[in-house]
A protein has these predicted regions:
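Conserved phosphate-binding and hydrolysis motifs of nucleotide-dependent enzymes
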Residues: 59, 148-149
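A short His-aromatic
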Residues: 126-130
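A short glycine-rich, Lys/Arg-flanked "PGG" loop and its adjoining helix->strand segment in the class I
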Residues: 136-147
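Short conserved AdoMet
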Residues: 50, 132, 146
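Conserved N-terminal segment of class I S-adenosyl-L-methionine
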Residues: 1-117, 121, 125, 135-138
Length: 149
């Protein structure tokens, strides 16, 4: 099934105001069981995280996990990357409109992306099953983690 047309349609409705975007994030949290598990694991990880925290959301999509993490941890520096430039632009616009200066989004192909020892945590949800060169991506993730990350 092709999800991009559905995502585009949803985006055109929910991107019209910050309020609707937040409603959309809440609906995703309610409809997708994995959201509950991801938020739980991020909370557990955050309870032991110290110092300056940098997070990479690899395959950030609509940015719902970046919204969650930046809401709970405003001191974290969060970078979302994706291959869909339209979603990157939408996310940058939304997070700018709501004043979340600790979150940014950029284009990145995960098979070639590394940012040496930059991140304490790398989150990648519903992404790896779409990438044939998954071993290369995990090598890149490892190279991008800070020591102990």
């Amino acid at each position: 099934m092709q999800y991009d047309p559905i995502k585009r349609s949803l985006g055109s409705v929910f991107n019209s105001t910050p309020f609707l975007r937040k409603v959309f994030y809440r609906l995703l949290d309610l409809l997708l069981l994995r959201s509950w598990h991801i938020r739980r694991e991020v909370r557990k990880w955050a309870s032991t995280a110290t110092g300056d925290i940098s997070v990479l959301d690899a395959g950030s999509g609509f940015g719902q996990y970046d919204f969650y993490m930046s809401s709970k941890n405003p001191g974290w520096k969060i970078r979302g990357v994706d291959v869909k430039e339209e979603q990157i632009a939408d996310c940058n616009a939304f997070f700018t409109r709501i004043g979340r200066r600790n979150v940014s989004f950029a284009f990145a192909d995960l098979t070639a992306f590394t940012d040496a020892s930059a991140y304490n945590l790398i989150l990648s949800v519903d992404v790896m099953e779409h990438i044939l060169e998954d071993v290369a991506v995990f090598r890149n993730f490892h190279a991008s983690l800070k020591p102990g990350g």
